Amino acid sequence: MPTQRKIETVQELTEKLSRAQLVVVADYRGEGRGMSVADMTELRRKLREHGGEVVVAKNTLLKIAANHTGRGALDPLLAGPTAVTFAYDDVAKVAKALLDYLKSGNKSFTVRGALLGQALLPADALEQVTKLPSREQALAQVVGGIAAPVSGVVGVLNAAISNVLYVLQARIDQLQPQSSS
């Protein structure tokens, strides 16, 4: 019989998984004794600055939440001590913050893999995720792609109107009586 606390934890994880665009699964014990409280606090602070968060949870509860959200692809990554990083808005910034933390020399936090949307990614693909455009950049690219044909049409119409005006002005000049020199 599940306890009330486990039910609440599954609900929280389900909510986080459904909101997250990127989910990174890692082993937080890695080599030696694992992450210290200070290390975990520092990682949480860095991720929070970029709109992400890291949670340590039981694998069985994570599997239940993943299946509730249609993200059962996470199941193979959920073994052993597990920390899950959630990126809600700017996936690239959260991935970069996580990668910077990993490069800082902490061997006790090792990425097992990630889920970007519904695509399961290997651990080494995290660096590629950092190269994705931010939400604002992606929107600007879409708007630019939509606006480019419109501005081209405006330019063509302006040129056509100008040409008609030049022809009319030339005809007016022809019809005006020539002044004697």
From Swiss-Prot:
> Has the keyword Transferase been applied to this entry?
no
| InterPro entries in UniProt | Ribosomal_uL10, Ribosomal_uL10-like_sf, Ribosomal_uL10_bac, Ribosomal_uL10_bac_type
Q: Which SUPFAM superfamilies match?
A: Ribosomal protein L10-like
Q: Which domain of life is it from?
A: Bacteria
Annotated GO biological processes are: translation
Which CDD domains does the record match to this protein?
A: Ribosomal_L10
The family this protein is said to belong to = Belongs to the universal ribosomal protein uL10 family.
Question: Its biological function?
Answer: Forms part of the ribosomal stalk, playing a central role in the interaction of the ribosome with GTP-bound translation factors.
What protein name does the entry list?
Large ribosomal subunit protein uL10
Q: Which organism is it from?
A: Chloroflexus aggregans (strain MD-66 / DSM 9485)
Gene symbol here is rplJ
